[in-house]
From Swiss-Prot:
Name of the protein in question: Polyribonucleotide nucleotidyltransferase
Residue span of region Disordered: 691-737
This protein's encoding gene: pnp
Family affiliation: Belongs to the polyribonucleotide nucleotidyltransferase family.
Originating species: Streptococcus pneumoniae (strain ATCC 700669 / Spain 23F-1)
Gene3D superfamilies: GHMP Kinase, N-terminal domain, K Homology domain, type 1, Nucleic acid-binding proteins
PANTHER family: POLYRIBONUCLEOTIDE NUCLEOTIDYLTRANSFERASE, POLYRIBONUCLEOTIDE NUCLEOTIDYLTRANSFERASE 1, MITOCHONDRIAL
Pfam families xrefs: KH_1, PNPase, RNase_PH, RNase_PH_C, S1
InterPro entries per the UniProt record, alphabetical: ExoRNase_PH_dom1 (IPR001247), ExoRNase_PH_dom2 (IPR015847), ExoRNase_PH_dom2_sf (IPR036345), KH_dom (IPR004087), KH_dom_type_1 (IPR004088), KH_dom_type_1_sf (IPR036612), NA-bd_OB-fold (IPR012340), PNPase (IPR012162)
Bias kind Basic and acidic residues: ranges: 700-714, 725-737
Known role: Involved in mRNA degradation. Catalyzes the phosphorolysis of single-stranded polyribonucleotides processively in the 3'- to 5'-direction.
Ranges of Basic residues composition bias in the record: 715-724
Domain S1 motif: start-end pairs: 625-693
Co-factor(s): Mg(2+)
Record: residues binding Mg(2+): D489, D495
Amino acid sequence: MAKQVFQTTFAGRELIVETGQVAKQANGSVVVRYGESTVLTAAVMSKKMATGDFFPLQVNYEEKMYAAGKFPGGFMKREGRPSTDATLTARLIDRPIRPMFAEGFRNEVQVINTVLSYDENASAPMAAMFGSSLALSISDIPFDGPIAGVQVGYVDGQIIINPSQEQAEQSLLELTVAGTKHAINMVESGAKELSEEIMLEALLKGHEAVKELIAFQEEIVAAVGKEKAEVELLHVDAELQAEIIAAYNSDLQKAVQVEEKLAREAATQAVKDQVTAVYEEKYANHEEFDRIMRDVAEILEQMEHAEVRRLITEDKVRPDGRKVDEIRPLDAVVDFLPRVHGSGLFTRGQTQALSVLTLAPMGETQIIDGLDPEYKKRFMHHYNFPQYSVGETGRYGAPGRREIGHGALGERALAQVLPSLEEFPYAIRLVAEVLESNGSSSQASICAGTLALMTGGVPIKAPVAGIAMGLISDGNNYTVLTDIQGLEDHFGDMDFKVAGTRDGITALQMDIKIQGITAEILTEALAQAKKARFEILDVIEATIPEVRPELAPTAPKIDTIKIDVDKIKIVIGKGGETIDKIIAETGVKIDIDEEGNVSIYSSDQDAINRAKEIIAGLVREAKVDEVYRAKVVRIEKFGAFVNLFDKTDALVHISEMAWTRTNRVEDLVEIGDEVDVKVIKIDEKGRIDASMKALLPRPPKPEHDEKGEKSERPHRPRHHKDHKPKKEFTETPKDSE
């Protein structure tokens, strides 16, 4: 296929798509150029159906450092494991694509996005999402797209599509919305306490922009799209399905309605084990035994799925007996752990999260070196999901994509209420340990994080709570669920997480299994979520009404001073000599930023005070008319040099030592003497002149006698006009210093 180029303008930037030139052996490939960002997307599909009971879709987003003209860090100087941002972007692309494959599709599909050129003002992640959909759409892979996504900002009351870097820094909203031309199917957002009305407006305007991108894709697909391949879908034997439903559906219905999670799981598993045993015996010698038993497992899963959904949509009964808008029992505990800087335990039904706070000097911030300019990350929220939380064994090791994603969601939700660096100059780390899980553990971690921050004395603007909303839809009717549990998440159509304060939303995340949801459903879900959020905040605020006024005794104490930028080198010293000496002498930690903010950390307040005193002395400047207790450090014929403080000396000229005339400096002061001096002049080169006599009382003028004549005074001897006295010279150097 020959190279073809398609071009349009979107959100004020040129959008160019090239096909037929590179990666031609993939099922589908495109090069997307948005502004000066360039992304190559290649989509491939396996020839045969994969084994397993899930759709093996893999989406990668690969950041090549050359795209930004940078060398990779580390010893190897080569790209390694994906960064956190790359992992989150891959998830962002995966989520709207996954629902667009047919039920029962089991062929492995890989979508690889490679960033070849990076323009920070033209979103490479959105170009990659566009490219992923387009590569699948023009390929022969059975994909029911296209989809597209955009970033949405909110600046000065205006909604902006795909904001520039400068606009993004000013924005109160960081929203990504994706969907089909008919509906939204993915949302990811952080926001600075925006109302439900503004969030809904941003979502709908974002979807309007999505439609523009989809229309452009449809134009390209019409020109270069391949005919879709016919692939085998996973189907179960209809007769076998009818037989099992007739015999065991009533047993499974009873098991599904057991309210307690572990008991319900045991009851449903008992029914499944019974059915499996019957058919293993019945078809033990059948040549298609493996296929039949796979069908049996799939039929039982479908029966449970259908019954859970029927109970909710028809009977309005949830598996645990709650109403559709009812939250599970709540419990909040603070100070769960000693020694740590703050801790909170939050429980919602059978979902429980422990959050632990650690405060550290700003030197512990995380350095992020990706395609964007390097920056320091002050706040980290890490989420751990051990298998024991669901009563199972499983893999332990580095966090997976799900844990990274849930940690990032909590981070966005809580970051919006953190104090500024000037208000609270600490690096902040929260770790959420999920101890039990029956759905919505990410939102429990947000609630526990709020407890830990407030307990630890971090002056957050307001408490944050999170809730997960669900959806059961049969196409004609739908039911929105508040606080979904694991079974409702697994068999439902939507997982819509909403976090915020009483004043507004701080984070959103929505994933759906159907091809999209309407504005009506979004509106209802946001309204129910607000009501639930307030109920949870009631519990949090009853447990800890306000942020504690002091940090934990084990937390590092901190003091800050501001110095002139040109004084930074004085505090650091040659090769760090001065600052290292201060640290060694006092035992503190010291951080200095480029703006001259000096942060001093220690568990010992006296050590902080001593270090602060030393630094203040190093950067102290003499001022005219100020008085100092100074020490004589050098004597010259023309005066004495005195040390005002630290490395700052001044000259006291011999004429400024006393009101009476003297010819010898040594007659008045000696090296080591301490004298009071007043600064009388600082020249343009910073040289300081001081005076001792300015602090002494001025002697009275000579008195007159009664006749008005001056009192007698010693007469200077007269010299003969031919006799010239020997002239005395006083050395006055050109530069007194």
